[in-house]
Amino acid sequence: RIGGYFFVDHCTGAVIGETAVIGNRVKMYQGVGLVARSLAAGQALRGQKRHPTIEDRVTIYANATIVGGDTVIGAGSTIGANVFLMQSVPPDSLVLMDDLRVKVTTKQERSVAPIDWQI
């Protein structure tokens, strides 16, 4: 299921798995993968949610990969470029790579220690 006002820019290499759910006003850039985890040998696939859920107003930047049917990206979150994510994140989170580790910060944490954005 894909919600309204879904925006894909530079769609080359984007992969949206069969059971992915994408909310309203989601923006996604090139090379993004919404993919499944490997399942145990012989596990039935029919009727199983294997791909992530992306809630409303999420932005996913280039070459990010979000894995797994239990993974939920909370509304209003931003997933940075080149992030490999196998866990859910709360609404209004910012997810970036930090020294080859995924770093998730909530909106509340960022208001305590604001990030100086220069774009």
Residue ranges and their predicted role:
Residues L39-A40:
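PLP-dependent aminotransferase-like
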Residues K107-I119:
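Terminal amphipathic alpha-helical/low-complexity segments used for targeting or macromolecular assembly
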Residues Q43-H51:
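Regulatory activation segment
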Residues G3-G4, D9-E18, G23-N24, M28-Q30, ...:
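Left-handed beta-helix
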